[in-house]
From Swiss-Prot:
This is 2,3-bisphosphoglycerate-independent phosphoglycerate mutase. Catalyzes the interconversion of 2-phosphoglycerate and 3-phosphoglycerate. It holds the Pfam family iPGM_N. It comes from Anaplasma phagocytophilum (strain HZ). Its cofactor is Mn(2+). Binds 2 manganese ions per subunit. It is an enzyme of class 5 (isomerase).
Length: 496
């Protein structure tokens, strides 16, 4: 029996909410979604904690979600892996090489990383452990703090800076620059933002304050929250030297690449660069925790069958449907086509909650109509990226936009005889306000996410499961045997 072509729609940040007043998905106008969940087979998937390879209770994120969906197994994520290994980092050969190089040249260490306990891109405890180790070798550490305010509350930096100051009080370390992640962790080629952070770190240019707390107070007094703090030089810091070493403490790669790339390109004299992980196959820097290869992902299985597949997303989420979905592989598989639609050029996405969803759908529908792809994977970024702004009305518009796009995809799938699957990578827009703290909620959630099958052959029902069960379910619909590497399970029951 030949299987069906499948269109897999991943709705970023679209969790199962409570239906309360701050649930943007429930509050938005979503006629297609309402019909789909009432008429099509539907179940719920766990997208956080140990079910996606994270520590218990840790919220999911886009990287982890796409890895789990695309690989069909629970992959031990960097956060949990580093948690297990960080106390032995003083023995890590790459760290020892890094230290020896600095000692031989008489330089200092520049440590760059996101300062929070959000656990999405970094963990402050990792940074603090490494600072203690490096200063223990007699090396001065300049810390280039990136403020979060996105995976944690928007005005929480005082807590994290206070914790860091307490940690380094008796160590040969100091905060050299402070910048919001809006500048230091852009991933949408807004190089003007990246350049402001780079100039502060490399050349000590930009606004200057006497201390990190003073800089934060000035920012708050100007109405600017953590994420958007303008890169600021602290104290007497005067920039990098060729004899120095640079260590990035973020373990997730997508929001490191622009700043790292700028450093490698514009300051090639600094050759001693170390990362928590291998951020890119093209940027060959040493890593404390090298990647572990993942074989027989969904994309690889489709390719091995000689079938064509398509990945499509806008800039903000393109890496997720390609690199992460393929288990950390940068190059496309044979037969894998990729389409990237530019994200809109706005400072924050609540200014354009539609983002590029309509343009994605225009291109996607054309490809579905061609019937050349056995598997099509699309990401709609709206609920997540607009959810991160904390703007409820904008989030509702974002959700409504995605709903209208899903309707177009559904009609195209039906006309092409394809099965349409709808799921999400993690929650976000279903919780837009934190009642306890009386402030907008901008972070991810630990909500379950939906899993809906539209236009399937025959009478089927779905079991609840985990994100890692999506790939086996796709293979089941395509009538392709599931490889033993995939430990997830098809969620389909065929009712005869």
């Amino acid at each position: 029996m030949s299987g069906s072509n499948v269109v897999l729609c991943i709705l970023d940040g679209w969790g199962n909410g409570s239906g309360g007043r701050y649930d943007a998905i429930h509050a938005a106008y979503t006629p297609f979604w309402d019909t789909a969940v009432s008429c099509c087979p539907m179940s719920s998937l766990s997208a956080s904690g140990t079910d996606v390879g994270l520590p218990s209770g840790q919220v999911g994120n886009s990287e982890v979600g796409h890895i789990s969906i695309g690989c069909g197994r629970i992959v031990l994520q960097d956060l949990l892996r580093i948690n297990l290994e960080i106390n032995e980092v003083h023995k890590n050969p790459k760290l020892l090489d890094f230290v020896r190089d600095i000692q031989a040249k008489g330089g200092v260490c520049h440590m760059i990383g996101l300062l929070s306990d959000g656990g999405v891109h970094s963990l402050q405890a990792h940074m603090e452990t490494i600072i203690e180790v490096i200063t223990g070798f007699g090396i001065k550490v300049f810390i280039h703090v990136i403020l979060d305010g996105r995976d944690v509350p928007p005005r929480s930096a005082e807590k994290y800076i206070g914790m860091l100051n307490a940690k380094i009080e008796h160590l040969n370390a100091e905060i050299a620059t402070v910048a919001g992640r809006y500048y230091a962790m852009d991933r949408d080629n807004r190089l003007d933002r990246t350049c402001k952070a780079y100039d502060a770190i490399a050349y000590a240019t930009g606004p200057r304050s006497g201390s990190a707390m003073e800089a934060l107070e000035k920012s708050y007094n100007s109405g600017v929250t953590d994420e958007f703090m303008v890169p600021t030089v602290i104290g007497d810091y005067d920039g990098m030297g060729a004899e120095d070493g640079v260590l990035f403490t973020n373990f997730r790669n997508d929001r490191v690449l622009q700043l790292l790339g700028m450093l490698l390109h514009r300051f090639p004299e600094v050759s001693n660069v170390l990362g928590m992980r291998q951020y890119s196959e093209k940027m060959r820097i040493a890593s404390l925790f090298p990647p572990r290869e993942i074989h027989r992902s969904l994309g690889e299985v489709i390719s091995e069958r000689g079938l064509k597949q398509l990945r499509i997303a806008e800039t903000e989420k393109f890496a997720h449907v390609t690199f992460f979905f393929n288990g950390g592989r940068e190059e496309p598989f044979t037969g894998e086509d990729r389409i990237i639609i530019p994200s809109p050029d706005v400072s924050t996405y609540d200014l354009k909650p539609e983002m590029s969803a309509v343009e994605i759908t225009d291109s996607l529908v054309e490809r579905i109509n061609s019937q050349q792809y056995a598997l099509t994977v699309v990401n709609y970024a709206n609920a997540d990226m607009v959810g991160h702004t904390g703007n409820m009305e904008a989030a509702k518009k974002a959700v409504t936009t995605v709903d209208s796009c899903l309707q177009r995809v559904f009609y195209a799938a039906v006309n092409a005889g394809a099965v349409m699957l709808i799921t999400a990578d993690h929650g976000n827009a279903e919780k837009m306000f934190d009642v306890q703290n009386d402030s907008p909620f901008t972070a991810h959630t630990s909500s379950m996410v939906p899993f809906v099958v539209c236009n399937a052959d025959g009478d089927i029902s779905l079991s609840d499961g985990r994100l890692c069960d999506v790939a086996p379910t796709v293979l089941d619909l395509m009538n392709i045997p599931q490889p033993s590497d995939m430990t997830g399970c098809s969620l389909i029951t065929r009712n005869s």
